[in-house]
């Protein structure tokens, strides 16, 4: 990535080829080559990027075409899919650029390479902020569904959801520009780390509160007949909350190594053990791209309506309810 994340080496670097000047000496100390940078073939990044793009485009098409999916939660999922597409597109384009540079088929100026590097890093930054904000928006949506069920449709309308999505992407665009402007400052990394842990803590608090309330509520209505439809509605709300909890868990699992990488760059850039960890940067990028691949699978697994819409789109069927 940019020099604020990964110290520059003797040749132009991009995320997929991040180098650390101290790594060779650390490797010699280890004696086993553990600190050597992990090399991942460009084909892996390209394959993950293509699969992720196709999956997330399918998610967006499904929500747009099926009127039954025109609800705030699914619009937020569309926005999350767009964020996943952005990170996959960024890494794929960057991989292609790295291949071109290494093949010597084109001679590119260092200034141009650095400029493109900042753009790709900015795209990843935008994707990260968008993912966090959309996950938080979905968490709030589920929170309102459970705690204010009777007023949900007046509190969280489609218009409000779309306005919130637009606001999220405007803020993400501003963050992307700021990332390029202050690309040499470590404060960019500090801000990303702070946002990540603050949002995770906030979402964790919301979900704990939701599940504790839902558990108590289910216990209270367990003995009552479900004639009024309260139990099925509560079950539907909880199913949505469980789905988003799974998404949040996968997000944390896939992004946490990358953020630990950033933390170590800030706190112990010369420590041999920290250098060993940061030498596996490419592995953390693969995990990030895997998150973009896994998310659509979670949508399909947890939503029968979305799964059926996927089948109808892929099979070219016309029996779809368009709203």
From Swiss-Prot:
GO terms for cellular component: cytoplasm; plasma membrane. Keywords: Biological rhythms, Cell membrane, G-protein coupled receptor, Glycoprotein, Lipoprotein, Membrane, Palmitate, Receptor, Transducer, Transmembrane, Transmembrane helix. It comes from the Eukaryota. InterPro entries: GPCR_Rhodpsn, GPCR_Rhodpsn_7TM, MC3-5R, Mcort_3_rcpt, Melcrt_ACTH_rcpt. SMART domains: 7TM_GPCR_Srsx (SM01381). Coiled coil: none annotated. The chain crosses the membrane at residues 38-63, 76-100, 119-140, 161-181, 187-210, 246-268, 278-301. Receptor for MSH (alpha, beta and gamma) and ACTH. This receptor is mediated by G proteins which activate adenylate cyclase. Required for expression of anticipatory patterns of activity and wakefulness during periods of limited nutrient availability and for the normal regulation of circadian clock activity in the brain. This is Melanocortin receptor 3.
